[in-house]
């Protein structure tokens, strides 16, 4: 993990899991995180319309140029949704850093994939390290392994493990 991102994530810890996930996704400067940023909608590597820091959905307006403030609002809304979707399935206490890494992960892969994952099963068995290690398995999109996803998962894994070692 780049030192600037590590420092930004550490600074976000007091703000809770959503703040941690937001910093992971946006990065220290707001456009150098795990998702990058595009203010104009585009199709991602699997053909899904995407805007800002990875926002997807029917509310994307094609042809619109989004502002930084609009992108921040979309991310905050999306991360609150992720939290509501997955928190009920996590049955054990986990550190906020682990939860923040999971929010970032689920923001990328979707709550449905998380709910049926070995990763969640391991968390609920109390095997946090084993769960965090499972992140390394999620590096494919469209049937192809992507270096960017490998890098992302290593960073999410590192944050997931904070406080565990």
From Swiss-Prot:
S-S bridge residues: none
InterPro entries attached to this UniProt entry: Bacteriophage_GH24, Endolysin_T4_type, Glyco_hydro_24, Lysozyme-like_dom_sf, Lysozyme_dom_sf, SAR_endolysin-like
Phenotype of gene-disrupted mutants: Mutants are unable to form wild-type biofilms, which could be due to altered peptidoglycan metabolism.
Active site: 35 (proton donor), 44 (nucleophile)
Annotated catalysed reactions: Hydrolysis of (1->4)-beta-linkages between N-acetylmuramic acid and N-acetyl-D-glucosamine residues in a peptidoglycan and between N-acetyl-D-glucosamine residues in chitodextrins
EC number(s) on file: 3.2.1.17
CDD domains in UniProt: endolysin_R21-like
Keywords linked to the UniProt accession: Antimicrobial, Bacteriolytic enzyme, Glycosidase, Hydrolase
Job of this protein: Essential for lysis of bacterial cell wall, by showing cell wall hydrolyzing activity. Exhibits lytic activity against E.coli and S.typhi cell wall substrate.
Family named by the database record: Belongs to the glycosyl hydrolase 24 family.
Annotated protein name in UniProt: Lysozyme RrrD
Organism in which the protein naturally occurs: Escherichia coli (strain K12)
């Amino acid at each position: 993990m780049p030192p600037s991102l590590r420092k930004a994530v550490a600074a976000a810890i007091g703000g809770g899991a959503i703040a941690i996930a937001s910093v992971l996704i946006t990065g220290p400067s707001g456009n150098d995180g795990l998702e990058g940023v595009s203010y104009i909608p585009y199709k991602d590597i699997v053909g899904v319309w995407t805007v800002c820091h990875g926002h997807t959905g029917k509310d994307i307006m094609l042809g619109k140029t989004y502002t930084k403030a609009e992108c921040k609002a979309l991310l905050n809304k999306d991360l609150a949704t992720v939290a509501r979707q997955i928190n009920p399935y996590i049955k054990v206490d986990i550190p906020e850093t682990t939860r923040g890494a999971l929010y970032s992960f689920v923001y990328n892969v979707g709550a449905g994939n998380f709910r049926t994952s070995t990763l969640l099963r391991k968390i609920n068995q109390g095997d946090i390290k084993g769960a965090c290690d499972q992140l390394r398995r999620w590096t494919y999109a469209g049937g192809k392994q992507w270096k960017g996803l490998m890098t992302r998962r290593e960073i999410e894994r590192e944050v997931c493990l904070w406080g565990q070692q």
